[in-house]
Swiss-Prot record:
UniProt gene name: CNGA2
Protein name in UniProt: Cyclic nucleotide-gated channel alpha-2
Phylogenetic placement of the source organism: Eukaryota, Metazoa, Chordata, Craniata, Vertebrata
Organism expressing this protein natively: Bos taurus (Bovine)
Residues noted as binding 3',5'-cyclic AMP in the record, renumbered to the chain: R536, T537
Annotated spans, Disordered: 1-61, 640-663
Start-end of Low complexity biased regions: 12-23
Spans within the Cytoplasmic topological domain: 1-144, 198-222, 266-272, 380-663
Localisation per UniProt entry: Cell projection, Cilium membrane
Site (Central gate): residue numbering on this chain: F364, V368
Length: 663
């Protein structure tokens, strides 16, 4: 009723605000309120402000056109500023209790430490900071993908065009377009690198001078500058069909490797990507080797011996596709050390083949090592899971378990593997810090925790402790989760599957529990006065395979040890639930409260007696210590007096006698 009343009262104000002129600057509270609006409100604001624009423009129809246009531009600029600035999504209040206030992007104050003297300078600096790319962000990754394309194009086609003249001359218009498009991307990448932030003391640096200095003093900057030197001007001297003058474009290779590294960390299938990446590297090496073989054959002379490429005057070997495929075939046979190629004849041919064989051995070793390790990593999870199954099978055979039970266990393992539920979450997340583990657990179990009634008013710290203690469990068809009369030591939350509340015969069904339901939460609290006591009141059985989250009583008690207030809130919440359901014996509660008061009084008396005994012992120790100190002081005073008397006596004996007077 309060929320509805508040909504009714606030609606006129909201309607009034729609007719108010848009403000260019707002106070801090207004900015905060605007930033916390949901994004769905943007459409309403847009339509209302455009309607306002039309209403403001209507009375001006008969006035001058220039004035109407100026007013229109001003309102549009204000509308664009308010609607296109960054807005944060509305946070989940339940989630915020776990996570605390979110850290917004913190801009470091760089340079000489002096701020801008006027607001215009600050606005300009903030506008420039919008173009600083976060190297861990999505836009930077998309740019890496874009820059990797021209790099890969140059590494694959530039050398092929330099070696195969037919490829260069037949499509030189296409190559010119692609070359200069890649040059534009290279130049743009140089400016992007100047606007790419980096972390300093954990914060993203956005100062322009620092970004520029950080990039310029690296080796990569020198390579990037060398890769955009306009060597194409040499075309005027040697001709347009000499693409080898653009070999400096190959120096931009680091961006392609960076894209591959980031993709490997982002992809959900890193092993497959590593294999694909390895195959790409091998294909590029074979491609380059084929081009070099063709270039050597051209320099020696086509068909002069059996090792070089056959004479291109032969129609069978005189067209482009056959030239490239033949060279690629020769390169593949050589680098894979298969052989079966014509032996070299000249010394330079021998040297090239020896070099190829060495490269081939390295490639073969790399392939065997990398592919072997990748396959081992891909099968590591399966091998570990299979080892568990084998151990269980061996145990069941040793203990002569029945075939039906053995088949049931095997089906349970099959269900875990088929539905990807064989991962031990605690083992996987143990390498993460506690904060990240809590964040992941909250994101995974948030919707589940919201359905538990007793956790609605708990402290955020306790909820974080509890969410880390939830353990997933999988039950097979027909398994009993709990039986009537059992002592309740766990509470369960159903993630997937269906459970039935059945009679003692196990057949008659009283109720059906589905995903999102929870049970057993009251029994683990040990609430005094509960008519259920600490025992289960129903039989709950799994109809199929069911995924449940379990929270044990020991884990709950361990968590609430450090949160006594939260424990009291949990017990009060549990009493309210029991009272609503008529399961709380108020007389027993009152009696237990009286017993608690009596126990507290007895405990207080015991504590008072203990304190009195300790005080008396301390007083006796103090009195004894005081007497000892007095005795020591008396002894010291006596010794001091005796020393003073001895000193005065010795001074009298050592003093000279006065001389006798003469008569």
């Amino acid at each position: 009723m309060t929320e509805k009343a508040n909504g009714v009262k606030s609606s006129p104000a909201n309607n009034h605000n729609h007719h108010a002129p848009p403000a260019i600057k707002a106070s801090g509270k207004d900015d905060h309120r605007a930033s916390s609006r949901p994004q769905s409100a943007a459409a309403d604001d847009t339509s209302s402000e455009l309607q306002q624009l039309a209403e403001m423009d209507a009375p001006q129809q008969r006035r001058g056109g220039f004035r109407r246009i100026a007013r229109l531009v001003g309102v549009l600029r204000e509308w664009a500023y308010r609607n296109f600035r960054e807005e944060e999504p509305r946070p989940d209040s339940f989630l915020e209790r776990f996570r605390g206030p979110e850290l917004h992007t913190v801009t470091t104050q760089q340079g000489d430490g002096k701020g801008d003297k006027d607001g215009e300078g600050k606005g300009t600096k903030k506008k420039f900071e919008l173009f600083v790319l976060d190297p861990a962000g999505d836009w930077y990754y998309r740019w890496l993908f874009l820059i990797a394309l021209p790099v890969l194009y140059n590494w694959c086609l530039l050398v092929a065009r330099a070696c195969f003249s037919d490829l260069q001359k037949g499509y030189y218009i296409v190559w010119l377009v692609l070359d200069y498009v890649s040059d534009v991307v290279y130049i743009a990448d140089l400016f992007i690198r100047l606007r790419t932030g980096f972390l300093e003391q954990g914060l993203l640096v956005k100062d322009t001078k620092k970004l520029r200095d950080n990039y310029i003093h690296t080796m990569q900057f020198k390579l990037d500058v060398a890769s955009i030197i306009p060597t194409d001007l040499i075309y005027f001297a040697v001709g347009i069909h000499n693409p080898e003058v653009r070999f400096n474009r190959l120096l931009h290779f680091a961006r392609m490797f960076e894209f591959f590294d980031r993709t490997e960390t982002r992809t959900s299938y890193p092993n497959i990507f590593r294999i694909s990446n390895l195959i790409l590297y091998i294909l590029i090496i074979i491609h380059w080797n084929a081009c070099i073989y063709y270039a050597i054959s051209k320099s020696i002379g086509f068909g002069v011996d059996t090792w070089v490429y056959p004479n291109i005057t032969d129609p069978e070997y005189g067209y482009l596709s056959r030239e490239y495929i033949y060279c690629l075939y020769w390169s593949t046979l050589t680098l894979t050390t298969i052989g079966e190629t014509p032996p070299p004849v000249k010394d330079e041919e021998y040297l090239f083949v020896i070099f190829d064989f060495l490269i081939g051995v390295l490639i073969f070793a790399t392939i065997v090592g990398n592919v072997g390790s990748m396959i081992s990593n891909m099968n590591a999870t399966r091998a570990e899971f299979q080892a568990k199954i084998d151990a269980v099978k061996h145990y069941m055979q040793f203990r002569k378990v029945s075939k039906e039970m053995e088949a049931k266990v095997i089906r349970w393992f099959d269900y875990l593997w088929t539905n990807k539920k064989s991962v031990d979450e605690r083992e996987v997340l143990k390498n993460l810090p506690a904060k990240l583990r809590a964040e992941i657990a909250i994101n995974v179990h948030l919707s589940t925790l919201k359905k538990v009634r007793i956790f609605q008013d708990c402290e955020a710290g306790l909820l974080v402790e509890l969410v880390l203690k939830l353990r997933p469990q999988v039950f097979s068809p027909g398994d009993y989760i709990c039986r009537k009369g059992d002592i309740g030591k766990e509470m369960y939350i159903i993630k997937e599957g269906k459970l039935a509340v059945v009679a003692d015969d196990g057949v008659t069904q009283y109720a059906l529990l589905s995903a999102g339901s929870c049970f057993g939460e009251i029994s683990i609290l040990n609430i005094k006065g509960s008519k259920m006591g600490n025992r289960r009141t129903a039989n709950i059985r799994s109809l199929g395979y069911s995924d449940l989250f379990c929270l044990s009583k020991d884990d709950l008690m361990e968590a609430v040890t450090e949160y006594p207030d939260a424990k009291r809130v949990l017990e009060e919440r549990g009493r309210e639930i029991l009272m609503k359901e008529g399961l709380l014996d108020e007389n027993e509660v009152a009696a237990s409260m009286e017993v608690d008061v009596q126990e507290k009084l007895e405990q207080l008396e015991t504590n008072m007696d203990t304190l009195y005994t300790r005080f008396a012992r301390l007083l006796a120790e103090y009195t004894g210590a005081q007497q000892k100190l007095k005795q020591r002081i008396t002894v010291l005073e006596t010794k001091m007096k005796q020393n003073n008397e001895d000193d005065s006596l010795s001074d009298g004996m050592n003093s000279p006698e006065p001389p006798a007077e003469k008569p």
